Amino acid sequence: MVKSMRTRFDEQLRQLNVELIRMGSLCEEAISIAAKVLEGEKNISNERVFAIEGEIDQLEHDIESLCMRMLLQQQPVASDLRVISAALKMISDMERIGDQAADIAELCPYVGDTLAQGRLHITNMARAAVSMVTESVEAFVQGDLKMACKVVQDDDKVDELFLKVRAELISCLKEEVGDPEAILDLLMIAKYFERIGDHAVNVAEWVEYSITGIHESNEHHPQNVL
C-alpha cells in the first residue's frame, strides 16, 4: 500500500512538473508577444496576450487542485511538502506575470513611437524577463539550486534597464519632448516589466526553498521551515 501510494504521488509530481512547465511557457509567450506589440510588429495582436492570460488563470486553478489532492490523498514527507508548498507560491507569482503582460498589451496602443531608445531598453527588459521565467521553472523541475540563484542575480540587469528608461522618460517630460501621456504610459510599461522580473525572482526563491527548506525572506534569521 505504501509503495502504491508513493508511486501515485510520483505520478502526480510528474504531472505537476508538466503543468508548471506549461504555465511558465505561457508566461514567456505572453511577455514576448507584449514586447512585440510594443515594438509595433505587424501581424501581432494584443488580443493573444489577453487569451493567454485566461489560460494562465485556468492553469493556476488546475495546479492548485492538483496540489490539494497530493496533500489530502497521499502521505508526503517533509521534502515533498516543501515542493508542493513552493509550487503553490510559484503559480501565484506566475499568474501575476500573466496579469502584468496583459496590462502591458493594453497600454501598447497608446504609446505610439515614443522614445525609440527607451523602447529598446524595454525590449531588453522583456528578453531578460523571459529568460528569468524560463530558468526559474527549469530550476524547480530539475532541482537546480545554482540556476535558481542565477535568476535572483539576473534581476539586477532588469532593474538597471528600468532605471535607464525612467531617467530618459523623466528627461523627456522635463524638456517637453513628445506626448506626456504616451511617455507616462511607456514608463508604466517599463515598470510592469520590472515587476515581472521581481515575480520571476519570487519564483526562484521558492525554488530555493523547495530544495533547502530555507526561504530568502528568512535569510537574516535562517531556519528550516520543514
What is each model feature region?
Residues 1-226:
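Cytosolic, long alpha-helical scaffolding segments
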